[in-house]
Each structure stands twice: as C-alpha cells, then as structure tokens.
Amino acid sequence: MLVHRLNALKDNYVFVLEDEAARTAAVVDPAEARPVLEALVRLGLKLVAIFNTHHHHDHVGGNRELLEAYPGIAVYASRRDRGRIPGQTVELEDGDTVAFGCERARVIFVPGHTHGHIAYHFAGCGHLFCGDTLFAGGCGRLFEGTARQMQHSLGRLRELPGETQVWCAHEYTLGNLRFAHTLEPDNAELAERLRTVEVLRARKIATVPSTMAAERATNPFLRWESRQLQRAAGAIEPEEVFAHLRALKDRF
C-alpha cells in the first residue's frame, strides 16, 4: 500500500492510499475534494472508500463532492459520529477491522479531541492515521473530551511499534517542538529534531509522517514519566501531567 500526502486548506494533510495491484484508492480525512480528485486522475486510480477519523469540517469537507464523483463508495467513521459524517455508510467501534486491498486496519477509539475520534492502524505495513489526536511533536486540543480521555488515548497509541509511520492531519510540527523545547531544554533528541524541522519548514518541506519512536522520545504529550515534564507540570500522575501540559500549550 502506497500513501500519497496531499496539501489541503491552510495546513491540512489528506492521505490517498493506493492499492497498486487493483489500481484503487481510499482517502483519509478529505478536507476538500479537489486535490483528491486531481490526484486520482494523475495517479490513474479509482476511489473505493473514505476513512474519516472524526467529524470536524476540515476532515470531512470533501466527502459530499467525492460521493458525487464516485457514488456508492464506502464511508467509514465512528459509530459515535452518526449523523455528523456526510455520507457515512459504516459505523465503527474500537477493535473493528477494515480492509483496503490486501491490507487491514484496526480501529482504535481515541476520544479526547472529540467524543467519537478514531484512528486507523495498518499493522501489516506499519501506518497509523491518527487525525487530530496525535500530532508530530504534539496533540490535538480538547474540544469535546477530557484530559483523562486524551491521556488514555495517547497512551494506547504510544504502545504501537516504534517504526510505525505516524500520519497526522496537520503541519503543526515546528510550533509543537518549539513548545516542547521550552519544557525539556536538556532533551538532546528533541533539540536535534527541532533543528531538523526548522530547516525543513524553511524550505517548505513537510514533516509528516513521523515515527512512533520519534514521538516517544520528543513529544511531551507522550512523556508524562519525564521528571523534567513532571516538574514543569507540578504533578506526577500521568493524567495530571498531561492536563497541565495541555493547558500550557493552549496558552503558548
């Protein structure tokens, strides 16, 4: 399975998944339809499915137009987002599996950013599509869920293999790492990653995907055991550390 990263809106990423043998495609979180339709023509692919992680408009805004161009395709999303996902045909629960070509994704329920947020983990090829739950160097805001939910969700994701490719839906990495560095100035791996990302963004080069290993080493929202982060948060319990760090990031 190939993954094609498309730019959309201001800073969104949309992902077109390609089944090379069947010449079919699925799209993850189509913020808008036009870049997807153009990519399908360019790549010579037929769209067969949409995978939505949550209901926010910048993740489902292209659904209707894609359904007009490809009527009858499957639209996967959380059962908890029933009525909020345009064209949804399949309601997913934690632990469900969805197939695309020869690959299968496990659905991981990751509430926090929204009540119904899910992620798709293609273990066979090592890809995670996590929407706005886990970002490169950061995590999503708590719009509907609680800090406890989000910390638990991130804890589930950080247990995935280190080589997992983390495909998040926004280019927020530079700001996230600058914030992280204020909290852990002695984290050498974080400092090196920040320098690398500064160079990449100066050249308008994308920083997505990252890897789960890089996130575990440098993302403060996965590092609640860090003594330095515990001191910054004034807490020890993982949920409390996360909540304090998220509040600090909201004001950064």
From Swiss-Prot:
Cofactor(s) this protein requires? Zn(2+)
Mind telling me what this protein is named? Hydroxyacylglutathione hydrolase
Q: Which UniProt keywords apply?
A: Hydrolase, Metal-binding, Zinc
What's the superkingdom here? Answer: Bacteria
Give the UniProt family note. Belongs to the metallo-beta-lactamase superfamily. Glyoxalase II family.
Record: residues binding Zn(2+) 1: H54, H56, H113, D132
Q: Which GO terms describe its molecular function?
A: hydroxyacylglutathione hydrolase activity; metal ion binding
Please give the catalytic activity noted in the UniProt record.
an S-(2-hydroxyacyl)glutathione + H2O = a 2-hydroxy carboxylate + glutathione + H(+)
For this protein, what is the EC number?
Answer: 3.1.2.6
